[in-house]
Amino acid sequence: MSVMKIPGHVNQKPGEVMLEEIENLLGDCKRCELGQTRSHLVFGTGDPHARVMFVGEGPGKNEDLKGEPFVGAAGKKLDSLLSIAGLTREEIYIANVVKCRPPGNRNPKPDEIEACSPFLREQIRSVWPDVIVCLGNFASQWVLKTDRGVTQLRGKLYQQGHFVVAPTFHPAACIYHSDWQPLLEEDLARVGAWLAANPRGEVTAAAATAHNVRPVADAAGKKTPAGAGLPEEAAR
């Protein structure tokens, strides 16, 4: 699926399409069945020029009620761990693969992910972060265009054009699997080390080598999820 074109902004460069315009284009979205059952569409929030963008799976009950991402228990868990990467909530941008809560917190369906994909892709294109932290299976598989699970993907950084991608566990999973939290902390520390060594605007190929950043091909699986993938400019 190609980059979605915002009306009136077909020649915009990365970082020039405003998040507000993308949200307005979403409107009262009914592009899939989730639009019939949600309370609120949950677009995304945070610093529109963040160096680090977090991508989760989808809204939970609290997020659906408030219309904001990561405001429930998983959000509190994430907030408590951000300092490991040298970050605060105010310094990041955060969004989800799907914008509406799947009923009963079930997994999002392929057609639901595909319906939301152009909008997530444009959010990434607007923020144009240096690092994308993928929280859980669905975010990791979408960004890295693979069917491999996060347990196989985590523990490494991947280079995808402009972006460094860090797959890790979803903080909600760590609430129920406490033995996964040290691994999430390890992954966030890896992100923090990369950020400290690579000031914005000074990222080099040598830095990627020094931090053992893997080519995105190392994440490849047997199947690409429907609608998955970063903006086309990422490969340039």
Language model features with spans:
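A polyanion-binding, active-site-adjacent surface
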Residues: S2-R236
